[in-house]
Amino acid sequence: MFANNGGGVRGDLAAVVRAILLDAEARGPTKTAPDFGHLKEPVLIVTGLIRALSGVTDGANLEVVTGNLGQRPYYSPTVFNYFMPDAKVPGTAILGPEFGIHTTVTAIGRANLVYALVYGGYAPNTTIPTATGTRLFLQQFESLADNPAAMVTQVNQVLAGGQFPAALEPTIVTAVNAVAASSPITDGQRTARARMAVYLMASSYDYQVQR
């Protein structure tokens, strides 16, 4: 399209942008093929949760945390970035570059990272003026804590645009229902239920694999 916009014109950037945005892969339905999508990098998991949940961060501790998962920002081990472009999903012929830094250790580390973010965040760096630390805000889910099904549906909508598999929600609803709640429900119980829902969804591979 850059070389020829269809009318013999080279370098028509408007035509290039139009072709990208209107491409069938961009406009078509959600892809369901098992080999479609990619594993989110550790940094994208962190930034994605902070953005989706209106969080704040001063960056303190995150460099070390994501570094333990194989992706320390600004410290790529080679000129080829953090992983090789031809890396494959272990045991398959499917290209999955991000799996180049994915091991049994970092798989557990991902779940621990999500847990730390959801259940407390990271303290501010006291050497940085006006430091905020890293925190997520779950109030939009806490208000639905007395209706776990509605809460889980809202978490699904916020984290994945409602695209998580239908079978996932009932499982998480059961887990949220298992979090004790009195009548009337207390603020602490609302927070506990919201944390459970967000943690289970964000640590699942339905969230960590972007489609």
Predicted regions and their residues:
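Flexible, low-complexity segments enriched for small/polar residues
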Residues: 1-211
